[in-house]
């Protein structure tokens, strides 16, 4: 029987970084999709003073990276930045509900390719990146996992900054 413990562990981390539950009572999470669920429509395109990236632009970036990494590591390696297949909307006009569906589909497609790996030996197999290098499959998957977590934090910070109180939740709740 093929050894898949590494693949299964990466798949669990992938899902946790993308849609992990977090703390339900306070809507706090380090997961991308969970954080997006707590973003108001007003905050979707809003910018704090001095900022240049909205939550909308961050989500478009994350989705586009999922599409590109998937195409180069597991597909035909023919997609290009700046094309509708990779970047379906310009910043400032992306319909939030459609972006959410697109992001989920891009994530599911990438996860399905990882889940289809035959065994853990494939995690060491070099695969293409969209900048021309070959990297081990596990590196590509790890990069996408940490990419979700990184931008989830960025979204969380923007949402907090745009809101009425960006103190730590435990301080807001009187514990600090």
Q: Locations of the language-model features?
A:
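Short, contiguous alpha-helical
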Residues: 1-36, 41-87, 128-176
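Acidic/histidine-rich alpha-helical segments that form the ligand environment
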Residues: 88-128, 135-147
């Amino acid at each position: 029987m093929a050894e898949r413990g590494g693949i299964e562990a990466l798949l669990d981390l992938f899902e946790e970084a993308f849609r992990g539950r977090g703390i339900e009572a306070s809507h706090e999470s380090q997961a991308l999709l969970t954080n997006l669920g707590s973003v108001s429509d007003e905050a979707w395109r809003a910018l704090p003073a001095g900022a240049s990236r909205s939550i909308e632009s961050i989500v478009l970036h994350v989705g586009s990276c999922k599409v590109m990494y998937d195409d180069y590591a597991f597909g035909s390696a023919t997609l290009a930045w700046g094309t509708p297949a990779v970047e379906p909307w310009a910043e400032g006009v992306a319909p939030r509900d459609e972006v959410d569906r697109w992001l989920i589909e891009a994530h599911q497609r990438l996860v399905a390719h990882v889940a289809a790996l035959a065994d853990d030996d494939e995690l060491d197999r070099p695969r293409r990146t969209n900048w021309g290098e070959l990297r081990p499959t596990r590196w590509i998957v790890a990069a996408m996992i940490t990419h979700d977590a990184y931008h989830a934090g960025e979204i969380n910070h923007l949402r907090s900054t745009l809101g009425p109180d960006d103190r730590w939740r435990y301080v807001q709740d009187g514990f600090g």
